[in-house]
Amino acid sequence: MDYTMVATGPTADSGMPSEPGFINGGMLAREESAASGPVVVMDVPSIDEALQTVERLGGSTVVPKQPVGGMGFTAYVKDTEGNVVGLWETAR
């Protein structure tokens, strides 16, 4: 995944803001997406476990787990109502 970091202020080695009041993040080109608007992304301890739980409860995986730079992993799921939700797992 080609990911570009965006910083609005001073940044620590982790990519997080090193001073209060700034928002850092990143951008990537979306290839195909089931979502037509903004996507809520939730931080989870384990994407693998979250994907299993979503599927067990009737949801589906839209985009499987994939690395994002050296920062972590992302995946996208669809719930039983058709909402697409992003998952984020920080690399450890």
Residue ranges and their predicted role:
Residues 6-11, 77-80, 90:
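Active-site beta-strand termini and strand-to-loop segments that position acidic
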Residues 40-81:
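Vicinal oxygen chelate
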Residues 37-44, 89-92:
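N-terminal beta-strand motif that seeds the catalytic metal site of vicinal oxygen chelate
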Residues 1-2, 34-36, 68-73:
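Short acidic/glycine-enriched loop/turn segments that link adjacent beta-strands
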Residues 3, 24, 74-76:
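Short hydrophobic/aromatic beta-strand element in the GNAT-like acyltransferase core
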Residues 1-22, 56:
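Core segments of cupin and vicinal oxygen chelate
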